[in-house]
A protein has these predicted regions:
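Helix-turn-helix/winged-helix DNA-binding modules
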Residues: 23, 49-52, 63
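Recognition helix of helix-turn-helix/homeodomain-like DNA-binding domains
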Residues: 35-52
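Short, charged recognition helix plus adjacent turn
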Residues: 2-3, 70-81
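Short basic helix-loop element that most often maps to the first helix and adjoining turn
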Residues: 15-34, 59
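A short, Lys/Arg-rich alpha-helix, primarily the initiator
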Residues: 1-23
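DNA major-groove recognition helix of helix-turn-helix/homeodomain DNA-binding modules
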Residues: 36, 55-71
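Residues at secondary-structure transition points
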Residues: 4, 8-12, 51, 55, ...
Length: 81
């Protein structure tokens, strides 16, 4: 069984979050401040060392300025394996 952290969908989510952060012109430390989290939290998510749940995805969306549904739609088009 494929570990969740290594799944194509998780990779797609990480890529999406990094793209959105960069598009917003935010550094990891800037996003961390908006999320009221540490920079290491952002790093762990972006490097696949930590999963984000739906609530966290919504927090990232609010902090960066994107629609969380857009991320979910993108993930739904990504193969499971």
């Amino acid at each position: 069984m494929v570990r969740t952290l290594d799944s194509p969908r998780h990779e797609a989510l990480r890529t999406f979050l990094i793209e959105r952060r960069n598009k917003a012109g935010l550094r990891q430390v800037d996003l961390a401040k908006r999320l009221r989290r540490s920079q290491s939290y952002v790093t762990y998510v972006e490097t696949g060392q930590k999963l984000v749940d739906v609530v966290e995805l919504m927090e990232w969306a609010d902090a960066i300025g994107f629609d969380a549904n857009e991320a979910i739609k993108r993930l739904s088009r990504t193969p499971k394996r």
